């Protein structure tokens, strides 16, 4: 849609947003003077989507249909035939092409008003300046390592004065989660690493001597038997020992996408199961490949729900029309549709966003303002442009971006006890601080 035609109240599909922005409400006490410009500014914001897989495709579609016109997407993968059942922006003719390129092309073809810039490669290969270009980043990743990297990068950027909100989505079968991370203000991804489910592993002694499950038999064939038979074997030795066709290539490294290799594991796993009187009816190509590739079945409906939540948070953050998620939403779809929202607390000992600590004594009748407190610590810590929130993640004053600075600046002149209470921890961030500064308000 042309930028001049973003908002025509009453006739445009975004007229509902215009009306909601015009009217003050319990979460929108100060309606913008010019809601059309507010919406235009939000829809013109540069947004980066990390990941163009099942969740990333849904996020791209939702953002484009919502009206966002300046999107970028980065992904290091190419399209595989197994992606086509749920990653709807791709088809068979796109196999082996970069996901980011094809996804961007398809979105712009179907929604010409949206410009999507693709980047094919690793997020780690981009510079800090690249990420500073965006007002919001949304993750649709399936990698813990990648999430940790972008989280620490955005925290580092925040410490230089540029605050870029991160909306993180994830899905696993019929379960999913969405969370909002305001770097250095709310808990970061690193704060909640202990919540992650540990990878399933089996003791080698169980696999070698006392298998009890079909999974044990598959792991034995994959981890112990394959290396024993083929570690230094030639292609010829493989064809002599087995009824299957020879390995492709010049070595005998296991390839989980090579159906001949999978068939070999199926055969050996069934033999192992029969030897130990373990039911083997479930051992087939799909079962074996799922174990060796650590595949968690992807469900399209879960991706759609989580993507919708992520895009809803993007709308709330960029239009400031409602409070954004505070700060974690979990979804469970195994027995109906269940969601639960709670606040993940910021860890003071977090290696990425951990805090310094101070105590500020204050009386119940004190008229000390938020600005007075910031000035007090600006002297001792040489702060230049500090932001402050409660430890629970409620922003009191954000120095950047400009829209949030304007929205929260009125709190500076307010008595601190009129906007929070004693025994509350304040979290101050500034580019001159190596980490966040925690200030406990203590009644004296």
UniProtKB/Swiss-Prot annotation:
Q: Which reaction does it catalyse?
A: ATP + [NEDD8 protein] + [E1 NEDD8-activating enzyme]-L-cysteine = AMP + diphosphate + [E1 NEDD8-activating enzyme]-S-[NEDD8 protein]-yl-L-cysteine
Q: Tell me which InterPro entries the record gives.
A: E2-binding, ThiF/MoeB/HesA, ThiF_NAD_FAD-bd, Ub_act_enz_dom_a_sf, Uba3_N, Ubiquitin-activating_enz, UBQ-activ_enz_E1_Cys_AS
Positions of ATP binding:
54-78
Q: Which pathway does the database say it acts in?
A: Protein modification; protein neddylation
Q: Which cysteines are joined by disulfide bonds?
A: none
Q: What family does the database annotate? A: Belongs to the ubiquitin-activating E1 family. UBA3 subfamily.
Q: What protein does this entry describe?
A: NEDD8-activating enzyme E1 catalytic subunit
